[in-house]
Design a protein with these regions (language model features):
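Small-residue-rich transmembrane alpha-helical segments that form helix-helix packing/gating elements
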Residues: 1-38, 44-181
């Protein structure tokens, strides 16, 4: 491979690596906060977020089928989708904590860990079952909001997507607020 080519793509690879690193930071932040409160690692942490994402996608699909995506401003649609996803994720997390984790707080440390792995498997299969029954296909192409797919060209060889900017800004804000508050 040519050295000039490597030097030319290095800034883009660096930006993509930083974005991925900030995604890992968000995941680690979530695990750390859950561990700090519950004092065990919740392996169902990501599945709870996936439920929120699927709720958002289902709302987005409902808006699309009703023709509302052309009428309602995208900022309002995004706000509705995010609030609904967060509300459902929060409710699912509370139910899981009260039914699967709280009764095991005084048990040996391995028992809640096994429970967390079981909850993770249960939620994965429940999501898979719901989506396959509801949509007849788990691998369905979902509509996206054009604003999230937009890319800003910084130079000829470097561009950044709105999704990457959202991840970076969210991670920086959350890490800063955790550090200072």
């Amino acid at each position: 491979m040519d050295l000039d080519l490597l030097i030319g793509i290095f800034p883009q690879v660096l930006l993509d690596g930083l974005t991925l690193g900030f995604m890992y930071a968000l995941i680690a932040l979530g695990y750390t906060m859950v561990y700090g409160v519950l004092e065990f690692i919740n392996f169902a942490h990501s599945e709870i977020f996936i439920i929120g994402a699927f709720v958002g996608v289902e709302i987005l699909l409902s808006f699309k089928s009703a023709g509302w995506l052309d009428v309602i401003p995208w900022v309002l649609v995004l706000f509705i989708v995010l609030i609904a996803g967060m509300a459902v994720s929060g409710a699912v997390a509370v139910v899981i904590e009260r039914t699967a984790y709280r009764p095991l707080r005084s048990a040996p440390r391995l028992i809640p860990l096994i429970s967390a792995i079981g909850v993770s498997f249960f939620l994965q299969d429940a999501i898979r079952l719901f989506e396959s029954l509801w949509r007849n296909s788990f691998n369905l192409v979902y509509p996206t909001m054009d604003v999230l797919n937009h890319r800003f060209e910084l130079t000829e060889t470097i561009d950044v997507s709105v999704k990457s900017l959202v991840v970076i800004v969210a991670a920086l804000l959350m890490l800063w607020s955790l550090h200072t508050l």
